[in-house]
Amino acid sequence: MTEVEKIYEFKEELGRGAFSIVYLGENKQTKQRYAIKVINKSELGKDYEKNLKMEVDILKKVNHPNIIALKELFDTPEKLYLVMELVTGGELFDKIVEKGSYSEADAANLVKKIVSAVGYLHGLNIVHRDLKPENLLLKSKENHLEVAIADFGLSKIIGQTLVMQTACGTPSYVAPEVLNATGYDKEVDMWSIGVITYILLCGFPPFYGDTVPEIFEQIMEANYEFPEEYWGGISKEAKDFIGKLLVVDVSKRLNATNALNHPWLKSNNSNNTIDTVKMKEYIVERQKTQTKLVN
């Protein structure tokens, strides 16, 4: 019996990836439940092993209410066990659609928590690099406004002067400076938050097309609109917030601190109801066309 098996009882499987299986685990003494990610080290390629090491290093460093926490780590010659905080609410967008509708103030509340978590990461010189709906999970089924950032597989810890140049992320959310291959920094996460906010408020992404190159062309020029049919009831402060994130010039893009001080996040009490029909359509379409850039 391994050390982790002495402490935790492994219950049902929660999910699996190419090299890992996630189980529901229960501490035998406290009865507290966790998600335990079991990674088969022998099957890892060099790139995946490097990303995994970076992910673990990051998880060890962070402690924020809106970031999924690493509780314990067990390393054996064959396997790595990550004992993680258990979140049970599912993916953010799925739960919004399930709820049927929500308000602009709800959206601002969610975005504020995401920006707070990203600002915390940036303060530690950590860039997530792959912020998207699938990586935004609800902590519980009961509270649709308590969100947590997950999946640090593409994240990097950066030095003060290091500029990253590896193309990574998911097409609809990737920042123009990543596509330009001229190097990029923390600002990429703020661009992704702009895209996520746009979708939260209307149900579809700002950049879309029949092919990935078409999407990239729109991103490179920040070519997007606020169609009146879907944005007529949304506040000008929300549009201004998005407009200050989806900026090609990174020097003009809001950082996390400035974003938290934006009027839309500081004092939003709008009860404008947001319909989720378009978001439901987007989720279905997204599941059909899951595509990633080469990491």
Curated annotation (Swiss-Prot):
User: What PROSITE patterns does the database record attribute to this sequence?
Assistant: PROTEIN_KINASE_ATP (PS00107), PROTEIN_KINASE_DOM (PS50011), PROTEIN_KINASE_ST (PS00108)
Record's keyword annotation contains Nucleotide-binding:
yes
Residues binding ATP: 14-22, 37
Positions of region (Autoinhibitory domain): 264-295
Describe activation and inhibition of this protein: Possesses an autoinhibitory domain. Autophosphorylation appears to increase the enzymatic activity. Activation is gbdC-dependent. Does not have a calmodulin-binding domain.
- Write down the chemical reaction(s) this protein catalyses: L-seryl-[myosin light chain] + ATP = O-phospho-L-seryl-[myosin light chain] + ADP + H(+); L-threonyl-[myosin light chain] + ATP = O-phospho-L-threonyl-[myosin light chain] + ADP + H(+)
Keywords in UniProt for this one?
A: ATP-binding, Kinase, Nucleotide-binding, Phosphoprotein, Serine/threonine-protein kinase, Transferase
GO MF term list: ATP binding; microfilament motor activity; myosin light chain kinase activity; protein serine/threonine kinase activity
Q: Gene3D superfamilies from the entry? A: Transferase(Phosphotransferase) domain 1
What the entry says about post-translational processing?
A: Autophosphorylated. Transiently phosphorylated on Thr-166 and Thr-289. This phosphorylation is gbpC-dependent.
* Source taxon at top rank: Eukaryota
Instruction: Write out the catalytic residues in the record.
Output: 130 (proton acceptor)
Concerning SMART domains, the annotation shows: S_TKc
- Look up what happens after changing residue 289 to A: Great increase in phosphorylation
Positions where Phosphothreonine occurs in the chain: 166, 289
Q: What is its EC number?
A: 2.7.11.18
Q: Does the keyword Lyase apply?
A: no
A GO BP term, please? adenylate cyclase-activating G protein-coupled cAMP receptor signaling pathway
One Pfam short name? Pkinase
List, alphabetically, the CDD domains matched: STKc_CAMK
| Bilayer-spanning residue ranges | none
Can you cite an annotated GO cellular component?
Answer: cytoplasm
Main role?
Phosphorylates a specific serine in the N-terminus of a myosin light chain. Phosphorylates regulatory myosin light chain (mlcR) during chemotaxis. mlcR phosphorylation increases the motility and actin-activated ATPase activity of myosin, contributing to chemotaxis.
Q: What is this protein called?
A: Myosin light chain kinase A
